[in-house]
Amino acid sequence: MNERSAPIGVMDSGVGGLSVLAEIQRLLPNETLLYVADSGHVPYGEKSPDYIRQRLRHIAGFLREQGAKAMVLACNTATVATVADLRALYPDWPLVGMEPAVKPAAAATRSGVVGVLATTGTLQSAKFAALLDRFASDVRVITQPCPGLVECIEAGDLTSPALRQLLAGYVQPLLAQGCDTLILGCTHYPFLRPMLADMVPADVAIIDTGAAVARQLQRLLGERDLLADGPARETAFWTSADPDSLKKILPMLWMQSDRVQSFPL
């Protein structure tokens, strides 16, 4: 296998990163993808940075053993806790992380009020505070931690009345304060777009960073002459939880796949 045809590793604390995986496949259809769902340790948002760093070192080492030419941290919480650590550990390995879309949201808002839905870990991080200082000094940013949403999505619940009530409890206070731009600061949350679209006025912009991450990955691979010229092989999945659970939820969030294996804990 030459370097161009080597796979790209993508990880998340669970299934949320599938929203990013879809954007990567859309932009880079010739690339072979590997996906690790660390669902046995979800949610990351309530875990300590040291715990998350330990998990990410393990996952990164595994993906390198699989021959991954690059790694995407398709998880905001993992990015803020570990991306600097991983870049120091693997300085020549292309690494792409996630961050809430503060810059485009601050540019898009008309009311001057931006809402952020994210995990506690992301919202309390120094990296997020730096994003606000850099790009959002002229707008009001209202942050909303969203406990419970990740767990619902991990269980395959995208439509229940209980989920709708939970989500409305997070979104309605932001709208009441004049928010006209909503940042989805967790890769699980794009799967709630249909429900959100029913819940917010049509002129409220909903922004996530999946497509931007795919473009950044394309740029990094292009700079290193690592873009594949195809054809892609079938995506392989690993999970630190029950593989049958991931097999059941994949058709809802991605597509049917039997290539689901247990991730070595």
Swiss-Prot record:
GO molecular function list: glutamate racemase activity
A Gene Ontology BP annotation from the UniProt entry: peptidoglycan biosynthetic process
Active site, UniProt feature: C75, C186
Keywords carried by this UniProt record: Cell shape, Cell wall biogenesis/degradation, Isomerase, Peptidoglycan synthesis
InterPro entries on file: Asp/Glu/hydantoin_racemase, Asp/Glu_race, Asp/Glu_racemase_AS_1, Asp/Glu_racemase_AS_2, Glu_race
Pfam families assigned to the protein according to its UniProt record, in alphabetical order: Asp_Glu_race
Family: Belongs to the aspartate/glutamate racemases family.
Name recorded for this polypeptide: Glutamate racemase
Taxonomic lineage: Bacteria, Pseudomonadati, Pseudomonadota, Gammaproteobacteria, Pseudomonadales
